[in-house]
Structure formats: C-alpha cells, structure tokens
Amino acid sequence: SDVVKELLKRGYSTLSPNRSELNLCSEDNIRNYILNSNCEAIVHCAAYTQVDKAEDEKDLCIKINATATKHIVKCAKILDIPMIYISTDYVFDGTKDGEYTENDETNPINIYGESKLAGEKYVQEILDKYYIVRTSWVFNINGKNFIETMLRPSKANNQLSIVNDQIGSPTYTKDLSRLLV
C-alpha cells in the first residue's frame, strides 16, 4: 500500500498483513497478531468498502468495519499506542450545502456509513491517542476505484450513465499517505 511505502521511505519498519495473516472476522486472530507484533502505532486502513453490496452483506460489512475495529482498538489500548482510523464521508447524509467538517452531525444513510461510524465510535470511546480521518473517493494507480470503474464502460460503449446528484472529493492514496505519516 502507499501508506506502507511512505512509512518505509521515512525510515519506519512496518507490518502490512494480508487477509490470510490477519483475519478481521476473528477476534482471537486480531488479538494474537497485534499483541505479538511489538508495534508502536496502528494505521487501520482495512475495510469493507463495497457500498452497494453492503446492503446485501450487512453482517459481513459490520463485522469488518465495526466489530474488527473494536478488537483492533482494544489491542491499541492494551499496548497504549496511537491509532489512525481511516473512515469515510458516508458517515454523513450528504444533504448539507457545502463541505462537511468534523464537527457536523453524522447521519449515515446506508449500512456502509453506519458500520464506519460504529468503528469511529469505538475508537473515540476506548482510545485516548487516536486520529480519525474521513476521506472519500479514494483512488490509486493500481487498484479498483471510482475513476477506473467509470472509465471502463465509457471506453467500451462510448456512453456512460451515472448519477448526477453526488458530489465528492477524490483522494489520491499517495497524497493521503503523505499526510497520514
């Protein structure tokens, strides 16, 4: 990930477990991995991010975005280390005219937003040392993202149908990584 690359560039050692190394659906696996890792901070980027599919996979979305976050937060508390939690603009309902700030009232309108807000609440309630970063439309040059998703069908059909009532701020992972580190 770009976060790992940025940390390494700045001289930090990192752990970046894949799904087989860190099963976010297993509290025991999370506890064992983190408590035995000797880490000095946690940057929690992992998430269930398929917003539409989350409506059909509610339990899995909540398990990954909320419950796993609670377990990670508990480990950070035990180790007395800071944590950065990557959240989303989906914690808001999108009805405000203008930009949202961290002081605006949250009001998620879907399971994804609800699950990320639940994760935020665990971070705030359990930890003293934390940052919550709400970002949107995250993209990089390699992965699936909104821009690639839109370009693919438009190239194939020379036509594209999308919603016209959504406003967002695309976030490049390299830029975000520099700010996080």
PLM region spans:
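NAD(P)H-binding glycine-rich loop region in Rossmannoid oxidoreductase-like domains
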Residues: 27-64
